[in-house]
C-alpha cells in the first residue's frame, strides 16, 4: 500500500514538473513572439517617417539682393530686411510630403515667410528664446534637392537656427550638411570638389603633361577653380577671383608638412627659378604650404585654353616644375613659372584634373568644365594620349554632406560639374572613356618654349 502510494505521488510530481516546464516554455514562447511583434512594429514605425534638423550654419545662403554671409559664427541667420532672401537646401531620395518648421525667436514680435516653389506659408514669432515653430505641410514632387526660401515679413527682427523637416513617407532619406565637425559648415557651403585621374602608360618615365579646358558660357561663377594639370606635388589651372579679375594659378607644395608657410625650414622651401612677364610669385597655406605663382589674365568662357607642365628631376635631390599656358586659338605659350622643389627626385606622377568651388558664399551656384585633348610625353619624347579617367569626389561629397556633383565623358572630352544643388550625383570610382583626338596632337617644340 505504501509503495503504491509512493508511486502515485511520484507520478503526480512528474506531471506537475512537466506542467511547470510546459508552462514556462509556453509563456517564454509568448514573450518571444511578443518581443518579435514589438520589434516589427517598432521597425515599421521608424520606417514610416522621421524628423531631421537642417542647421542653417551649413545649409543656408543669402541669395538676394546680392550674395553674402548668411549666418553668424553660431550658425544663426538674422532676418532684418524684407528685401533679403535666404535659401536653405536639403535632398530627398523620393517624392514625399514634408512638414516644415523652424527653430526661431524674435525681438518683440515678427514674422517670416517660407516657400517651396509656389507653395508658401507665413508664421508669426513672438517668443524671445529659440523654440521650434511648425510652419506647414509641403508637397515635394520629385526626388533630389529641395530649395526652401525664407523672407522676412512684418514686425521686428527674426532669427532662426535650424530648419525642421518631418515626414511620414516610408523609408525617406534626407541629406544635408549635418554638423560642423572638421569645419564642415565652411566646406559644405563651398560645395564638393570633383577629380579626374588620368590613365597613363606604366613603366615609362613621364616628363610633360598637356591638357585643354573649355568652360561653357555661363558656367564660370566667382569662386571657381578649373584645375587642368595636377601632379603629385602641385597643381596648375585657372580661376575666377572676382567680377573683374581672373587668374592662371600654378602652385607646388613644400615637402615640409604644414599649413603655415612661415614654419617651413629654409632648406625645404620652394624656390622660384623663373617666371613669365607680369607673373607674381608668393606663398600659400591652409591646405599644405608651398610656392605659388599667378598671372592675372582675362580668360573667357566659351574659349579653349591649353596647359603644359614639365616635371624634371635635376639629379641632385631636387626636381624642377615648369608650367606654360596659352589661348589655343592664338597658338600662344606664356611661361607662368618654374619652381625648384628640394628633397624630391621624381618624374611626372599622379596626373589629374579637378573642379573646385572656393567661395563659401557662392556654393549654391553651379559650374562646369570640359577637359579634352589630354596627353603625356615621356623622357624619350614620345607622346601618349590619355583616353581614360577615373572619377572621384572629396569628403564633402563622399560623406553625403553635398550630393550635387558629377562627371563623365562626352565624345572627345571629359566633363566635371559641381554645386548648384542639381539633382544628379556621380559615382566615385567610375571610369570614363573619351574618343581620340589624335588628329589634334599638339605640335610643341619644347626647346623653343619661353623659360
Regions of interest found by a model, annotated:
Residues 119-143:
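Extracellular carbohydrate recognition and processing domains
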Residues 149-156:
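Short beta-strand-plus-loop segments that form exposed binding edges in beta-rich domains
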Residues 109-119:
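Short, surface-exposed beta-strand/strand-loop-strand elements in extracellular ectodomains
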Amino acid at each position: 500500500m505504501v509503495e503504491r502510494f509512493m508511486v502515485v505521488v511520484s507520478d503526480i510530481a512528474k506531471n506537475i514538473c512537466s506542467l511547470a516546464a510546459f508552462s514556462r516554455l509556453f509563456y517564454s514562447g509568448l514573450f518571444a513572439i511578443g518581443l518579435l511583434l514589438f520589434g516589427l512594429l517598432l521597425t515599421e514605425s521608424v520606417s514610416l517617417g522621421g524628423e531631421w534638423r537642417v542647421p542653417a550654419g551649413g545649409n543656408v545662403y543669402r541669395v538676394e539682393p546680392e550674395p553674402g554671409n548668411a549666418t553668424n559664427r553660431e550658425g544663426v541667420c538674422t532676418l532684418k530686411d524684407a528685401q533679403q532672401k535666404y535659401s536653405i537646401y536639403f535632398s530627398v531620395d523620393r517624392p514625399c510630403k514634408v512638414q516644415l518648421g523652424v527653430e526661431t525667436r524674435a525681438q518683440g514680435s515678427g514674422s517670416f515667410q517660407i516657400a517651396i516653389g509656389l507653395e508658401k506659408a507665413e508664421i508669426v514669432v513672438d517668443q524671445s528664446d529659440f523654440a521650434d515653430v511648425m510652419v506647414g505641410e509641403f508637397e515635394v514632387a520629385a526626388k533630389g534637392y529641395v530649395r526652401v526660401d525664407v523672407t522676412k515679413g512684418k514686425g521686428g527682427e527674426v532669427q532662426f537656427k535650424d530648419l525642421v523637416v518631418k515626414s511620414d513617407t516610408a523609408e525617406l532619406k534626407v541629406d544635408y550638411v549635418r554638423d560642423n565637425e572638421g569645419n564642415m559648415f565652411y566646406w559644405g557651403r563651398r560645395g564638393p570638389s570633383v577629380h579626374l585621374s588620368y590613365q597613363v602608360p606604366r613603366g615609362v618615365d613621364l616628363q610633360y603633361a598637356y591638357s585643354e579646358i573649355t568652360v561653357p558660357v555661363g558656367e564660370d561663377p566667382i569662386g571657381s577653380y578649373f584645375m587642368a594639370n595636377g601632379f603629385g606635388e602641385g597643381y596648375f589651372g585657372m580661376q575666377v577671383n572676382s567680377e573683374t579679375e581672373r587668374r592662371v594659378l600654378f602652385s607646388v607644395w613644400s615637402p615640409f608638412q604644414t599649413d603655415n608657410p612661415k614654419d617651413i625650414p629654409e632648406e625645404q622651401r620652394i624656390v622660384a627659378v623663373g617666371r613669365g612677364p607680369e607673373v607674381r610669385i608668393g606663398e600659400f597655406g591652409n591646405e599644405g604650404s608651398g610656392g605659388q605663382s599667378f598671372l592675372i589674365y582675362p580668360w573667357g568662357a566659351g574659349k579653349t585654353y591649353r596647359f603644359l607642365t614639365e616635371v624634371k628631376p635635376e639629379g641632385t635631390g631636387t626636381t624642377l616644375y615648369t608650367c606654360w599656358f596659352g589661348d589655343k586659338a592664338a597658338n600662344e605659350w606664356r611661361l607662368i613659372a618654374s619652381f625648384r622643389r628640394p628633397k624630391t627626385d621624381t618624374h611626372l606622377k599622379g596626373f589629374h584634373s579637378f573642379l573646385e568651388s572656393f567661395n563659401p558664399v557662392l556654393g549654391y551656384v553651379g559650374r562646369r568644365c570640359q577637359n579634352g585633348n589630354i596627353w603625356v610625353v615621356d623622357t624619350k619624347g614620345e607622346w601618349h594620349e590619355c583616353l581614360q579617367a577615373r572619377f572621384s569626389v572629396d569628403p564633402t561629397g563622399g560623406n553625403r554632406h553635398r550630393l550635387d556633383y558629377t562627371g563623365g565623358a562626352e565624345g572627345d572630352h571629359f566633363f566635371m560639374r559641381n554645386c548648384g544643388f542639381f539633382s544628379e550625383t556621380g559615382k566615385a570610382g567610375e571610369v570614363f572613356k573619351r574618343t581620340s583626338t589624335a588628329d589634334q596632337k599638339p605640335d610643341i617644340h619644347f626647346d623653343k618654349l619661353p623659360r
